[in-house]
Amino acid sequence: MVRWLFLLVAMLLSGCANLGCWPNCAAHTRNSSSLVEFLYPHGEAPPVQNSIPQLKIPLRVGLAFLPSSESSATGGLDAAHQEVLLERIRQRFSSRPFVAEIVMIPDYYLRGRGGYEGLQGVQRLYGVDIMALVSYDQVVHTDENNWSLGYLTIVGAYVLKGSRHDVSTLVDLAVVDPVTHSLLLRAGGTSTSHGNTTLISENREIRGAAAQGYDAATNEMIEHFDTALTKFEADVRSGKAPVQVVHKNDTVRSGSGGGGALNWPLVLMLLAAVGIRRLERMA
């Protein structure tokens, strides 16, 4: 009898707690990193682009997550998970013929290095030609049922209350040239999920849903970036891309402007032919 009285009191107290927060029994947490805030930390407007980026292929590409500006215990993207996602991106694009190597860079190398000037320091440190920066934004909404007293379940000594969570995730990949302060290419992916849990396992299940959100959004971003990269390659070949491509051991191809690039092997052959002809005349 005493045991059942104890459980009844616990249920009533739990119900009163729920009714006490009605109708505002909801909360949200946010985890994010911002490309705009990183590149322009003082809120300045992006300048007008006056110079054409020069891409020296095959490229060494630096790949990194931008440091988080907001974080929480239930949905943060930890270093181990970042490495898994970066490796997934690296494997997808490292086989491209114009890529020599994709170098994964831990996000702590970018902390305190906001702006293009700081990015150039990382570029020199790792000896890369361009930087591929991954940013993200994830919001987790949790909401206890306003009438959760009717959904109480007694298991042993526990009184369980129902809770619902919604997880919205965006992952974005932007390729920038730190030297000319140019955005070369970008693509993003999103993910949205919903779930129900109990307050006892709420944090664990929300962390799992948050991790799945990063995975799903990254997978979609990779597909979108692959499409955008294929189009970018076609624009370079047709001269529509606002870049100048320099083959490190060969010629120059210009996307917009740049004009008459020299084919140096052909020039050397012509000079050699002229020299031989002069020697023949002297003989």
Predicted feature locations:
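N-terminal secretory signal peptides that target proteins for export/translocation
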Residues: 1-2, 283
